[in-house]
UniProtKB/Swiss-Prot annotation:
GO MF, one example: S-adenosylmethionine:tRNA ribosyltransferase-isomerase activity
Description of how the protein assembles with itself and partners: Monomer.
The UniProt record lists the keyword Nucleus: no
Subcellular location: Cytoplasm
Name under which the protein is recorded: S-adenosylmethionine:tRNA ribosyltransferase-isomerase
Function: Transfers and isomerizes the ribose moiety from AdoMet to the 7-aminomethyl group of 7-deazaguanine (preQ1-tRNA) to give epoxyqueuosine (oQ-tRNA).
Keywords: Cytoplasm, Queuosine biosynthesis, S-adenosyl-L-methionine, Transferase
Length: 342
């Protein structure tokens, strides 16, 4: 299947640069995955499409302030480090710019020495394995010295970093936000619960591979990045009960979808408490075992994310919906509007 099948024209001015003041005031396109029919709503009206006994599955990962600015200990040369993935203990997979002169043995200093690192290894795609040393707790030091790593297509500075977190973010570890969840407010979640709709949480730590373009013509040859996920016993029990009682499982975001499908594939369509790494790549032809509905933002052309939603709703339905979204001036990408596919 050719990557160009997932291309579409997107005017640059439709790429949202800032979040709306009211999270739930985003627009919501409701897409019927059977017929392709489209309705236009406000996001807070998503509740009218959810039924008692359904379950929304949210990714409770929290974005790290993963961008660090420092210098090489020997020369004082400036470096920028982006934390990608914790390997074990204080060893991290990172991107370093400029990276050519950061080789195994190179020492880096951040915040006047509050945080230090040594390069242990070089990786493909310009990656580096760094081992950090510090006083106290790593994430406290990171909160003091690090900056929020916004996606490359967002050019404007974010006034309030919490707007790039969901209101329910708690498990720190992501290099990017699970953006479908950015539209929910505490008030909307309370109203959803009061209607008898279950809310369950999984964790998937989003890596920057989310933004890595597909660089092969044939998508079957694309290798997905691996990301850490976990599901609790409480969430597994809720989901199995909802499924047994005939309720719908509605994933909030492609990250929740990939977690749910990974686990359902491993347990014959059921859910179980577990943690691990997933590199599942979902594209048309995939048979879904876990989800009945999907809340998602509008994605980049030729991205693995538009391939996933095309697998769920049909490529022609999705490309038509995106054509309508452009015509109707929907806002795209991380700070943009949302789509509900049911």
């Amino acid at each position: 299947m050719k990557v160009d099948l997932f291309d579409f024209h997107l005017p640059e001015e439709l790429i949202a640069q800032t979040p709306l003041p009211d999270r739930a005031a985003s627009r919501l396109m409701v897409l019927d995955k059977q017929t392709g029919a489209i309705r236009h709503e406000t996001f807070r009206n998503i509740i009218s499409y959810l039924h008692p006994g359904d379950c929304l599955v949210l990714n409770d990962t929290r974005v790290m302030p993963a961008r660090l600015y420092g210098e090489k200990a020997e020369t004082g040369g400036m470096v920028e480090v982006l934390l990608l993935k914790q390997l074990d203990g204080d060893r991290w997979e990172t991107l370093v710019k400029p990276g050519k002169r950061v080789r195994p043995g190179t020492k880096l200093v951040f915040g006047g020495g509050k945080l230090q690192a040594v390069c242990l290894d070089t990786l493909e795609h310009g990656g580096r394995v760094l081992e950090f040393s510090y006083e106290g707790l790593f994430y406290q030091v990171l909160a003091e010295l690090g900056e929020m790593p916004l996606p490359p297509y967002i050019k404007e500075k974010l006034d309030n970093p919490e707007r790039y977190q969901t209101v329910y973010a708690r498990e720190i570890g992501s290099a990017a936000a699970p953006t479908a969840g950015l539209h929910f407010t505490e008030e909307l979640l309370d109203a959803i619960r009061e209607k008898g709709i279950h809310i369950a949480f999984i964790t998937l730590h989003v890596g920057l591979g989310t933004f890595r373009p597909v660089q092969v013509d044939d998508i079957e040859k694309h290798n997905m990045h691996a990301e850490f996920y976990q599901m609790s016993e409480e969430t597994a029990a809720i989901l199995n009960r909802v499924r047994a009682n005939g309720g719908r499982i509605i994933a909030v975001g492609t990250t929740s979808t990939r977690t749910l499908e990974t686990i359902a594939n491993r347990h014959d369509g059921r859910f179980a408490a577990e943690s691990g790494w997933t590199d599942i790549f979902i594209y048309p032809g995939y048979e879904f075992k876990a989800i009945d509905g999907l809340v998602t933002n509008f994605h980049l052309p030729k991205s693995t994310l538009i391939m996933l939603v095309s697998a769920f709703a049909g490529r022609e339905h999705i490309l038509h919906a995106y054509e309508v979204a452009v015509k109707e001036q929907y806002r795209f990408f991380s700070f943009g509007d949302a789509m509900l596919i049911i």
